Amino acid sequence: MRLDKFLKECNVCSRSESKQVLKKGLVKVNGSVVKDASIKIDENKDVITYNDEVLKYEEFIYVMLNKPAGVVSATEDTRDTTVVDLVKEYAHKDLFPFGRLDKDSVGLVILSNDGKLAHELLSPKKHVSKVYYLKIKGKLDNSDIEAFKNGITLEDGYLTKEGKLEIIKSDEISECYATISEGKFHQLKRMFIALNKEVVFLKRIKIKDIELDESLNEGEYRLLSEEEINSLKNI
């Protein structure tokens, strides 16, 4: 890897800024000052320091975000704030969200630059489960639980795969947990519409074995732990 690319990956500076940084003699490779941005380094073996602090290279990073309402699950948008905008600390890593969460929904979003893992997690063949907490306009009963279990026919004729509905409270505004392994557009909202009910609040709380860290306020984020990363990769 070129030294200027390494410095960018470690969030020291942009590649265009690297010449100025190197000119100041602030970067050392294996103890020697280097001022040539184009030299090749081995990011796994060479010791590179900036201001005498060792730079640690990580090819992939994995971020848990508690998405607020009004933010879109995209890498860029001309009108709305995106989930990537909320994690600008890692802008140099070119993160993208693993799947979608509707603009008006809140909760768990995982972002990474690991395209291979994203492909695995989003593959319909993998049946990766996602759990949501919902508030529903209308009373829920056992017939709704059975409908989720057997699959629900949406307005376009699509029959959803088996899911799970756990009723917390049944009232004019009911509360429940819903588990599905698909990600069709507005899927849960459309499933409840098919049951003559309306979703008034939706929060994703779990993807596979990764649970939303409840210490994160909306808009806050943290890196996944090694245990969480390994759990994601164990598909």
What kind of region is each of these model predictions?
Residues M1-I235:
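Basic, flexible Lys/Arg- and Gly-enriched helix-loop patches that mediate nucleic-acid binding at interfaces
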